[in-house]
Amino acid sequence: MNLVAIDKPTAEHKPGAERKSAAKKIQNKKNENSLVPKNRVDFAFLDSGTGGLPYLLHLKEKSPYSNCVYVADTKNFPYGEKDTPRIIEAACSAAESIIKRFKPAAFVIGCNTISVTALEELRRRFFPVPFVGTVPAIKRAASLTKNGKIGLLATRRTIEEPYTAELAERYAANCTLISRADPDLVDFVEHGFFTASDAEKEEAVRPALDFFLKHDADTVVLGCTHFLHIAPVLEKLAGARIRFVDSKEGVVNQALRIVRPAAPSASSESAASEPAPSPSAFFITGHAGIDEAPYKTLCERSGLLYGGILA
């Protein structure tokens, strides 16, 4: 695929625009401050966008009293088309900001690309903060396949990283691994999926599905967390022909082995009532001109508090 750089015209300078930008930064800081849990954050989640949300939501199902923050590093989206040094730099920069701001008890990397490239460096640089990574569920796929043909739907960087090849060699040596990098599908999930019609969603996933059907894969690993959002669409179209697997259960279980938040004690005034689950806050990175509306809508649908742009 050829990558073409497109120069964007410089916006006309307007004095009022600077005042609006400054006001927006102040408002974002107010939002950020108001959404920081009063108690210590149990888990911080990081992805380049919305891919890690299914992991956060699944953790909240199992541990509703967990204090969580989620940061979508939209400033650096997508990670999957970058080279390894740039991914490490971006992930470490984001993690440093999150740790300084929220001081999480544990960190969940809700991104396969970050995990196979930068997890070791994150653990080294920010020790003793524990990091839980997300890697392609090749081991599980190998245990489920009937014909020995496993598909891997992921980003280019995840597919090309030696760590992924090591997983395949260790757990699926007797299987054929059929890989497909699909940056267009990642972009669709991030920027179009949540407002798309059913027909548009099916059209978007069809090329990937047809690819794996053509190669007779009976089990496909969703090796990019963004693809968990489209799993129901893939399952509907594939029927019994393909089983789709991911690492969500294993990642969440590991996170909860490290930190197991307990339900808060009921106050004396409401001792008979059950404490309410802790809300989770969602932040993005980027510039003041980024379109925040889709993320606000997604938070409303997911029961998350929108915190705005993380400074």
Language-model segments: residues:
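Non-catalytic structural scaffold of enzyme domains
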Residues: 1-8, 24-25, 29-311
